[in-house]
Amino acid sequence: MTTIFAIETSCDESAAAIVRGRTVVASIIASQIDVHRLTGGVVPEVASREHLQALGGVIAACFAEGGLGWADIDAVAFTCAPGLVGSLLMGSMAAKTLALVHARPLVGIHHLEGHIYSAFLSDPALEPPFLCLLVSGGHTSLVAVEDHGRYRILGRTRDDAVGEAYDKVARVLGLGYPGGPAIDKLAQRGDPRAFALPGGRVESPFDTSFSGLKTAVLRLAEKHRLQRLPIDRADLAASFQRTVVETLAERVELALAHTGYDTVVVAGGVSANRGLRERLGQAGPYRAVFPPMHFCTDNAAMIACAGVARFERGFRSSLDLPVQSRLSLEACDSLYQCLPVP
């Protein structure tokens, strides 16, 4: 069974993992949240420096946890796009050095493909085709996963990603960073119908827009402040979350009807949201698959799992593979020097 060692450094987590097949052998994550909380968001230069300081220890701890050596590893996978260039470079240099020193093949992985494969860690029997709702701080997309490595983007956000909207609303409510978990927790105590807020609907049936919703929350909070009226933050958080969740659920149900698929994978950092899990996890005509909670946010286990799928199908990357801040999920094959023969 294929065993992959992987590194993930696309943003503010320094992570390494070993996955055998679809089973996690070891996974280590060094988070930078406490560092970036001081500035209310990720500072790219700071993130790069933190990766540089953490990666050596993270890699050593990963092999120690797994009880394996390089003789057990078939290939090295790493996140090469998209993400913060400086952060990606830290992981790229480490992965390429290890692949070269230990004479192992290299497999570059698209970060969002990694998130899709995080669902395989909770359901090893999962197979395409299925629909994937990718929801994170930087991405909100509906993707038809037609086969392993074959993706068709059905819809995306026109402006703010879901996670970005959560962070901005959290700042308005004085909840700090990161905003997603803070709003999710506060919303459990509030009335989700206390405030009528505009949904994220646009003309395209599968696209979303959350800038109007974010602005509505900002204006509502400002109006109460100017009029010196009390505002229940829990009610506002619950109303905001309900609006987001219903908008996403509507898009998912439309896309499932359009594709004829009966399974939706929900992946990305926002897939940990309790409101979203409850809404999409309700009994219905479709099955919802979520990653394990500890693999919803950025981690290397998902990169390794995607690496297994790519490696077993003959994909290999060059040591010259550059990192890229932006790359469409539909362009994944551009990351590979050796492509399998059809």
UniProtKB/Swiss-Prot annotation:
One annotated GO molecular function: iron ion binding
Bilayer-spanning residue ranges: none
Subcellular localization: Cytoplasm
Note accompanying the cofactor annotation: Binds 1 Fe(2+) ion per subunit.
Binding site residues for substrate: L134, V135, S136, G137, G138, D167, G180, D184, N273
Positions bound to Fe cation: H111, H115, D298
Any single GO BP term: tRNA threonylcarbamoyladenosine modification
EC numbers for this chain: 2.3.1.234
Recorded catalytic activity of this chain's protein: L-threonylcarbamoyladenylate + adenosine(37) in tRNA = N(6)-L-threonylcarbamoyladenosine(37) in tRNA + AMP + H(+)
Membership in a protein family: Belongs to the KAE1 / TsaD family.
Listed HAMAP family: TsaD (MF_01445)
Protein name per Swiss-Prot or TrEMBL: tRNA N6-adenosine threonylcarbamoyltransferase
Species of provenance: Gloeobacter violaceus (strain ATCC 29082 / PCC 7421)
Lineage, top ranks: Bacteria, Bacillati, Cyanobacteriota, Cyanophyceae, Gloeobacterales
